[in-house]
Amino acid sequence: MAFRIWRFAAPQVFYPIAGKMIPWFMVVAAVLAALGLYIGFFVAPTDFQQGEAYRIIFIHVPAAWMSMFIYLVMAFWCAVGLVLNTRLSFMMALALAPTGALMTFIALWTGSLWGRPTWGTWWVWDARLTSELILLFLYIGFLSLHAAIDDVRRADKAASLLALVGAVNVPIIYFSVQWWNTLHQGASVSLTRAPSMATTMLAGMLLMALAAWAYSIAASFMRVRSIILERESDADWVRNLSEVKSP
């Protein structure tokens, strides 16, 4: 059983599997995003305090959730790569980073758009906003450090160490509204208490979160396939692929 699972860590085994899964995740992402946006923008009621401006949360909150979740998954693969020295683990971490950076940027950008009518300013050095900005810098730093080192194995290990150290920022982002007095509102969705929003609002937000999750998987699989082809370019199995043969 363990051997059967372990064989999926081989790039030549994972490459075709990822290729088959990408279209499915893209379709799921598109369908869920369409449903989530429809519910969020046309079905969910108007907020009695923020009016229509609050609807940006249907993009902002899922992006913020995914920015943290992707970083934790990236750090997990970095840890697996360092402990087990598996090439695919490092490739997965590298493939996740751009999507994580994109989600973090979207969270910051939509947060600024939301903050302008709510707080009267585009940006404040609030604990949650600042720690989310640090998360973006960590993603950029991970990618930059990896690109700056010519030796791939050394680059993998150095960037992985940075990712593991930066993982401490994720709980800071999540608990910042509890640890400090911040302008940012508390969590609307929690595992320990009932949600403080209408059912249709929650449904739209969860659908958008699942759409972001499915998109992130598809994008990461597309990227890791490119990384595999680049790193395994001298392998016989890559030369035999019809998609990389010269016409």
Annotate each predicted stretch with a short phrase.
Residues 1-247:
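Polytopic transmembrane helical bundles with strong interfacial aromatic enrichment
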